[in-house]
A protein has these predicted regions:
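Domain-level signal for Mg2+-assisted phosphodiester chemistry and nucleotide/NA-binding surfaces
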Residues: 2-110, 116, 141, 146-148
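A residue-level signal for conserved active-site and pocket-lining positions in enzyme catalytic cores
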Residues: 24, 59, 111, 126, ...
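Short, ordered loop/turn segments at secondary-structure junctions
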Residues: 26, 87-88, 129, 152-153, ...
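Short glycine-/acidic-enriched loop or helix-start segments at secondary-structure transitions
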Residues: 32, 136-137, 159, 179
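Amphipathic alpha-helical transducer elements in NTP-driven molecular machines
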Residues: 38, 68, 105-108, 134, ...
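Active-site histidine-anchored catalytic micro-motif
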Residues: 117-154, 165
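Long, low-complexity, charged/polar intrinsically disordered regions in eukaryotic proteins
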Residues: 149-192
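Positively charged, polyanion-binding regions of nucleic-acid-associated proteins
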Residues: 190-207
């Protein structure tokens, strides 16, 4: 069966169910910025609404970061709730200071909690290319949920794309761009396993 027909079939199946959209804002924004592109929140919401009635739409980031200063206003205008996740600076043994946040953990916890508390939601859409979310995907699917991921073609974890029921390329299926004109700069984002995320995932599932 052609991919377009398979996608239409999944959308038709999900259309009678409610939909939740969870956006890893920094992952999506950084990925697109590599090609000097911005996140089109309206297109993202419209894509989610093709799967049914969108009842939850959250975007996760450190909104106090200057880089995200104007983003919450655009998200609110599109009917998407900005969820604040603070960033902390960690000094490694080598003396290198790195910025870290807990978006993966917070988003995963909210998503799994939503699965338990809102059985009316049959479709979960994750806007991220981070392979660490495989744990979350593996939790939702046994509950009969349709799991869709949206990621940028040049920075998405192949492992994540392989685990979801349906994968959409943001730059091809959501907000198409001319990839010959907009070429990503630098290497793709890496997605390593996160022990803290796995631990949080296990705690939430036990609830």
């Amino acid at each position: 069966m052609p991919a377009s027909q398979a996608r239409s079939g999944l959308q038709a199946k999900a259309h009678s169910q409610d939909v939740a959209l969870f956006i890893d804002w920094e992952n999506l924004k950084i990925s697109l910025s590599q090609a000097i592109l911005r996140v089109n929140v309206s297109s993202l919401r419209e894509t989610a609404e093709t799967y049914g009635r969108l009842v939850i739409a959250n975007a996760y980031a450190d909104w106090q970061d200057d880089w995200h200063q104007s983003d919450p206003e655009n998200l609110y205008a599109a009917g998407i709730e900005p969820v604040y996740v603070p960033t902390r600076v960690v000094t490694e043994s080598t003396g290198i200071r790195r910025r870290k946040n807990s978006v993966d953990i917070k988003l995963t916890a909210d998503c799994v909690e939503c699965c338990h508390n809102h059985p009316n939601i049959g479709t979960f859409i994750l806007a991220s290319g981070d392979g660490d979310f495989i744990h979350m995907v593996n939790t939702l699917r046994p509950y009969g949920k349709l799991v869709v991921a949206v990621g940028v073609s040049w920075s998405t974890s192949p492992r994540l794309a392989a685990r979801v029921d349906q994968f959409l390329y943001y730059d091809k299926d959501v907000d198409p761009v001319d990839t010959q004109r907009y070429r990503p700069r630098g290497a793709a984002l890496n997605s390593g396993e996160d022990d803290a995320l796995q631990h949080a995932f296990e705690l939430v599932v036990e609830i």
